């Protein structure tokens, strides 16, 4: 079982995720024809991308598969492949490896006769395959009890001014979401109107770590605004905030858990 992927698409993926993590877990769902890429950033923050299987990302297998990919290592070795290469990614779960391979054929004039010259490249990278994550992505799409749009640069500017604090209070009032620093002196408050806000949600308040919000800084060059949702599970437990956007050709989700 392996994934065949165009090098341009692979470059996008590793360039993006290597800013946040040295490795990611890849989960291929052959039934839904989707590939999920997941990284745990620490501080109760998870990030994942959803990529449809297509001509540029093709899965050669019938069963679902989960494996780890060392994105930092892959990023540094892609210069070994031709710019038009289609790369096979084949995990070796038993030996804690992942293999990248590709070939390229060029025609060379030999005594006025074109001769095909084939170049094969294979790279084996070590990575612990015994700690792959099977992440329940659908859990965070079951229910939404609040929705707004947050301008990333303005949010980053706001939290830069309050770096002396550890968390923000999150409250809901009159169909608005309010982010506020603790206390009443030298207090900062940011308020967003919401396109969706359940009446039940406005009875609650939460806390979110500023260190978690700071992890959005890695998106600054790629994202202008995030669709932001307050998500809950099927038992109506409020889970946290889900930031979503489409970056280049794939959808990105960042989930942050509310603090107790």
From Swiss-Prot:
It comes from the Viruses. Keywords: Activator, Late protein, Transcription, Transcription regulation. GO terms for biological process: regulation of DNA-templated transcription. The keyword Transcription applies. Pfam families: Pox_TAP (PF03355). Induction: Expressed in the intermediate phase of the viral replicative cycle. Interacts with the late transcription factors VLTF-2 and VLTF-3. Interacts with the late transcription elongation factor VLTF-4. Interacts with itself. Associates with RNA polymerase to initiate transcription from late gene promoters. Belongs to the chordopoxvirinae VLTF-1 family. This is Late transcription factor 1. The lineage of its organism: Viruses, Varidnaviria, Bamfordvirae, Nucleocytoviricota, Pokkesviricetes. The gene is OPG093.
């Amino acid at each position: 079982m392996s994934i065949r992927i165009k090098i341009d698409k692979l470059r996008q993926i590793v360039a993006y995720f290597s800013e946040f993590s040295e490795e990611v877990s890849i989960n291929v769902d052959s039934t839904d024809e989707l590939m999920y890429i997941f990284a745990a950033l620490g501080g109760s923050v998870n990030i994942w991308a959803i990529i449809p299987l297509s001509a540029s990302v093709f899965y050669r297998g019938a069963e679902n598969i989960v494996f780890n990919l060392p994105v930092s290592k892959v990023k540094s070795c892609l210069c070994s492949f031709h710019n038009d290469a289609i790369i096979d990614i084949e995990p070796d779960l038993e030996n804690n490896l992942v293999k990248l391979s590709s070939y390229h054929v060029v025609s060379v004039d030999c005594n006025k006769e074109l001769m095909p010259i084939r170049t094969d490249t294979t790279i084996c990278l070590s990575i612990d395959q015994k700690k792959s994550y099977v992440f329940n992505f659908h859990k965070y799409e079951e229910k939404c009890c609040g929705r707004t749009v947050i301008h990333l640069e303005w949010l980053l500017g706001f939290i830069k001014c309050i770096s002396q604090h550890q968390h923000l209070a999150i409250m809901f009032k009159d169909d608005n979401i309010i982010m506020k620093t603790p206390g009443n002196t030298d207090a900062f408050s940011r308020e967003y109107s919401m396109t969706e806000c359940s009446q039940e949600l406005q009875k609650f308040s939460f806390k979110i770590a500023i260190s978690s919000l700071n992890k959005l800084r890695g998106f600054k060059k790629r994202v202008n605004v995030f669709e932001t949702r307050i998500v809950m599970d099927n038992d109506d437990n409020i889970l946290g905030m889900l930031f979503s956007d489409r970056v280049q050709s794939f959808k990105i989700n960042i989930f942050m858990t509310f603090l107790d």
